[in-house]
A protein has these predicted regions:
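N-terminal secretory signal peptides that target proteins for export/translocation
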Residues: 1-15
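Sec-dependent N-terminal signal peptides
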Residues: 17-25
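C-terminal motif of bacterial Sec signal peptides marking the signal peptidase cleavage site
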Residues: 30-32
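Lipolytic serine-hydrolase domain surface
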Residues: 34, 38-117, 127-131, 136-137, ...
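Alpha/beta-hydrolase fold active-site loops
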Residues: 141
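The conserved beta1-alpha1 loop
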Residues: 144-148
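Short substrate-entry loop that stabilizes the transition state in hydrolases
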Residues: 152-155
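Gly/Ala-rich beta-loop-alpha elbow adjacent to hydrolase catalytic centers
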Residues: 221, 225, 229
Length: 418
């Protein structure tokens, strides 16, 4: 976009410690604290009644010291790779969109998500894994998932496994995970960790672009992970003078991104770019908090796509918008609507995997989903089937922990440095 989406917005300012503390307590007040066991990535024996999802992981996280955690929220000097297999309990004990976290260890594969394989591998083994799985896939497609703010490593692994399973996606799953501390007060650290990871994600995308076995690449990002996805694509486009044709779909779920900066990022990618699908909800309270942190500049995931200047700019750039404001979700922050709506997971996921467009009237969702890009229906594409299960671990009441750290951080003087 040559013109910024929000012309009248004030320039964003870096979040200060008091603002971050205020934002964090907003999350805490909206969501209660519920614990769960740590070390859930310790492998267990498979159960024949459970489904399995295999994925390749690339991460800039440091190795964890505790068994069963694998990777921490600290930053590594170079990317690391891993092969993961996740067991998912039968649909009779879990509804689509849910991550069934174990209440105790070891997990029971009949009722819980469980880890069957968690092995760190070198780059050569990772490339071999990818090549083998792409050759086995029906269409040679790869899906890269980038999680959002406040995610531990296991959050990202289990959520991505849920997305792949519930959507019925045929793409080869590749998880790109960055050093999030999984703390509500680590917003600034997490944001800088996405910047820290840009080069690693770009290298992943460059490899997929060069690999002749990979026929199609789709990217699904959630919340703060959208910043990392957009920056990596922008960086790649500038370096390569455009993006490859095999990069078909980029799906931005509840993006915690400044609307002005998004306009600049899209413009920098040039005219040859993937199809972008934007999932917004105007009642997203998590993004409302983020907006206050960033100087009251609108966040991309909370815009009204029918209002100017968004409507005109989105239409001019062929960006599909799916407005989920009317979807009733189970979470207080309305930031988890994809994960909380099993009907959308099943219905839209199956349609997209079958090659139908997201705005196809045959979906029959009536007024519950408004797909609008200046009234035009734009094609989303075949490999976008997993969009419907966009992750939401940022506010998952069953995944929050380490509140002693939160209290200690709030108790520090506002001028303290580390």
């Amino acid at each position: 976009m040559k013109r910024h989406l929000a012309r009248n917005a004030k320039a964003g300012v870096p979040p200060t410690r008091p603002l971050l503390a205020c934002a964090a307590w907003s999350f805490v007040l909206l969501y209660g604290c519920a614990g769960r066991p740590t070390g859930v990535l310790e492998p267990v024996a498979a159960n024949p009644s459970a489904a399995q999802v295999e994925m390749l992981v690339t991460t800039t996280r440091s190795r964890a010291e505790k068994p069963g955690e694998m990777f921490s929220g600290e930053r590594a000097l170079s990317p690391t790779f891993a092969e993961m297999t996740v067991s998912i309990p039968p649909d009779t004990v879990r509804k689509a969109g849910e991550v069934a976290w174990p209440s105790k260890l070891p997990p029971n594969p009949e009722t819980d998500f469980a880890t069957l394989k968690a092995v760190e591998v070198d780059r050569g083994a990772a490339e071999k894994w990818l090549n083998t799985h792409v050759r086995k896939s029906p269409d040679g497609s790869v899906l890269v998932f980038i999680h959002g703010f406040n995610n531990h490593f296991e959050d990202a692994v289990f959520r991505f496994a849920q997305i792949i399973h519930d959507s019925g996606a045929r793409s080869v799953p590749v998880l790109a995970t960055w050093p999030s501390r999984g703390s509500l007060l680590a917003y600034g650290y997490d944001r800088e960790s996405t910047n820290y990871t840009r080069n690693a994600v770009e290298r992943l995308l460059q490899y997929l672009a060069r690999d002749p076995e990979v026929k199609e690449v789709s990217i699904l990002a959630h919340s703060m992970g959208n910043w990392l996805a957009l920056e990596s694509l922008r960086q790649m486009a500038i370096r390569n003078d455009g993006l490859p044709a095999k990069f078909r779909n980029v799906m931005l779920a509840a993006p915690d991104v400044d609307v002005d900066v998004f306009g600049s990022q899209i413009a920098d990618m040039g005219k040859q770019r993937p199809r972008f699908t934007l999932f917004v909800s105007r009642d997203d309270r998590a993004l409302a908090v983020s907006r206050r942190v960033w100087g009251n500049v609108s966040r991309l995931g909370a815009i009204d796509p029918e209002q100017s200047p968004y409507k005109e700019e989105l239409a001019a750039n062929g960006i599909t918008v799916v407005d989920l404001t009317k979807i009733k979700a189970g979470d207080n922050l309305h930031h988890t609507k994809f994960a909380e709506s099993p009907e959308i997971v099943r219905l839209i996921g199956s349609r997209l995997c079958s090659g139908q467009t997201l705005t196809d009237s045959r979906l029959g969702l009536g007024d519950h989903i408004v797909a609008a890009t200046a009234g035009a229906a734009h094609t989303v594409g075949t490999a976008a089937g997993l969009v419907v299960a966009a992750p939401a671990a940022i506010v998952d009441q069953n995944t929050r922990r380490n509140y002693v750290h939160h209290v200690e951080a709030l108790a520090e003087p506002s001028g303290a440095t580390r």
